[in-house]
Swiss-Prot record:
NAD(+) binds at D146, T175, D232, G257. Pathway: Cofactor biosynthesis; pyridoxine 5'-phosphate biosynthesis; pyridoxine 5'-phosphate from D-erythrose 4-phosphate: step 2/5. PANTHER family: FORMATE DEHYDROGENASE 1. GO terms for molecular function: 4-phosphoerythronate dehydrogenase activity; NAD binding; protein dimerization activity. GO terms for biological process: 'de novo' pyridoxal 5'-phosphate biosynthetic process; pyridoxine biosynthetic process. Belongs to the D-isomer specific 2-hydroxyacid dehydrogenase family. PdxB subfamily. This is Erythronate-4-phosphate dehydrogenase. It comes from Cronobacter sakazakii (strain ATCC BAA-894) (Enterobacter sakazakii). It catalyses: 4-phospho-D-erythronate + NAD(+) = (R)-3-hydroxy-2-oxo-4-phosphooxybutanoate + NADH + H(+). Its main location: cytoplasm.
Length: 378
């Protein structure tokens, strides 16, 4: 049995070799010759999985080590009798921590406290719900918009998108990409919505590029109307709008979810799904795969204020490290994908052990996802 895996899926060879012969291939594009004798295909979001890719092949299972599935034609896979699995929630923590890194940088630069701002979260799934929990742990007011969940009667105080635009100082998008239907998200942030954003608002998109109309966003920025923008995803990719990149506050190469933990979760989730598909279910303990963190222990004295939190967050991950490289290579063919392929290892907050002499600080850091303990420092 031959299993094709994206060459940028960490631990893929190590895990899938338990099930068969493994061949690592580029994700964009998948070499057609490699598909000829393959039984299974494991991809990331850069690979379009559809009839054009798989017609006439013997692929019986496709796994995507991503939470999103808009790059996969699931209808075709069902029609062709091909098994399928995604990795929902695998990188949710990573995306939340990306958003925090960006917000804390902007807060320091512009001199505001997060607790003085209202954050509107559009899409309250794996990412949005975790972002809400961490923001509220800090005492930040959040407003939630998720029409599918609201229509299902899920618990939660869901608002309309118009309400969020009116009330929120920060608007952050965490939806799937639906190009049509009752919950269409293509250009959810369209020209009209972008025009209504508060002067000085912050707009964040770390889900899918076309959720925000990039042309309309550029037009507002070119008009000189005050707006801070954080974009990790673009319309289109990989050939992003260079003029838009020049005007946003933070621009990165679709790497918000790229922690080592997030990538490893994606790989292990599709590995476990494929082993189940084969009738030989196996489970993997994530901790057995991950290397030791860069920092052993940090000692924190006193209460946790915003500047201290910013230092801890940026010790693990400072979003500016990914902004500068994209600006250097913007517009150069192939460089967007190279940034993603050669991405520097990044860890999650849980990899940082913080020893606190303040009990409340330890409790708050634990709620935020740090590996924190209370231990009076003598």
């Amino acid at each position: 049995m031959k299993i094709l895996v994206d060459e940028n899926m960490p631990y893929a060879r190590e895990l899938f070799s338990r099930l068969g012969e493994v061949q690592a291939v580029p994700g964009r594009p998948i070499p057609q010759a490699a598909l000829d004798d393959a039984d299974a295909l494991m991809v990331r979001s850069v690979t379009q999985v559809n009839r054009d890719l798989l017609a006439g092949k013997n692929i019986r299972f496709v796994g995507t080590a991503t939470a999103g599935t808009d790059h996969v034609d699931e209808d075709y896979l069902r029609e062709a009798g091909v098994g399928f699995s995604a990795a929902p929630g695998c990188n949710a923590i990573a995306v939340v921590e990306y958003v925090f890194s960006a917000l804390l940088m902007l807060a320091e630069r512009d001199g505001f406290a997060l607790t003085d701002r209202t954050v509107g979260i559009v899409g309250v799934g794996n990412v949005g719900s975790r972002l809400q929990a961490r923001l509220e742990a800090l005492g930040v007011r959040t407003l939630l918009c998720d029409p599918p969940r609201a229509d299902r009667g899920d618990s939660g105080d869901f608002r309309t998108l118009d309400e969020l635009v009116r009330e929120a100082d920060i608007l952050t998008f965490h939806t799937p990409l639906f190009k049509e239907g009752p919950y269409k998200t293509l250009h959810l942030a369209d020209e009209a919505l972008i025009a209504r954003l508060k002067p000085g608002a912050i707009l964040i998109n770390a889900c899918r590029g076309p959720v925000v109309d990039n042309a309309a966003l550029l037009a507002r920025l070119e008009a000189g109307q005050p707006l801070s923008v954080v974009l990790d995803v673009w319309e289109p990719e990989p050939a992003l709008n260079v003029e838009l990149l020049k005007r946003v506050d933070i621009g990165t190469a679709h790497i918000a979810g790229y922690t080592l933990e997030g990538k490893a979760r994606g790989t292990t989730q599709v590995f476990e799904a494929y082993s189940q598909f084969l009738g030989t279910p196996q489970q993997v303990a994530l901790a057995t795969l991950l290397p030791p963190p860069e920092f052993g222990r940090i000692t924190l004295q006193g209460p946790l204020d915003q500047p201290t939190l910013k230092r801890l967050v940026h010790l693990v991950y400072d979003v500016r490290r990914d902004d500068a490289p994209l600006r250097r290579v913007a517009g150069m063919p192939g460089e967007f994908d190279k940034l993603r392929k050669n991405y520097q290892e990044r860890r999650e907050w849980s990899s940082l052990y913080v020893q606190c002499d303040d009990e409340a600080a330890a409790a708050l850091l634990q709620k935020l996802g740090f590996n924190a303990t209370h231990h009076p420092i003598r």
